[in-house]
Amino acid sequence: MRDKTTREKALCYIVRDGQLLVFRHLDYSYEEVGIQVPAGTVKPGEDPRDAALREAREETGLTAFTVVRKLGVAHYDITPYRPEIQRRHFFQLALHQETPDRWTSEEDQDGIGKPIRFECFWIPLEHGHVLQSGQGALLGNLIDQ
């Protein structure tokens, strides 16, 4: 078995009126990527809080986010997808702009490669158990704290 690398990740729980902001990839099957919250890799030297705000903007196309609080850190082993342990920093974000119930956005990947297309939408917070790859692990902290 290959050695596993550890990667720092930032995940965003954006909640409004009891609804959680999620997305699906338009160019990949549901079976492959499921429903996700905005999340991504923390760049070298980047604060996880800043990474959370950046990922929320990049993946939703929205801009008016603020960090409410850090909810905690959890580790997730994504093997067999690839030999990697993700050290995930979970943040609750507030959104300060109106949105439709559903919209599409694109992440341009810093101009490298084809843009990634997303469909963003809101689901009831209590349906957060459907999130892909353990992304719902700290949803309970939204209520418990």
Positions of predicted regions on the chain:
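Short, solvent-exposed loop/turn segments at secondary-structure junctions
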Residues: 4, 30, 74-78
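Short, well-ordered beta-strand micro-motif
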Residues: 14, 92-94, 121-124
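Short hydrophobic/aromatic beta-strand or adjacent loop that forms the aromatic wall/cage
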Residues: 7-11, 86-90, 117
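Conserved N-terminal beta-strand and adjoining loop/helix that marks the start
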Residues: 1-21, 40-44
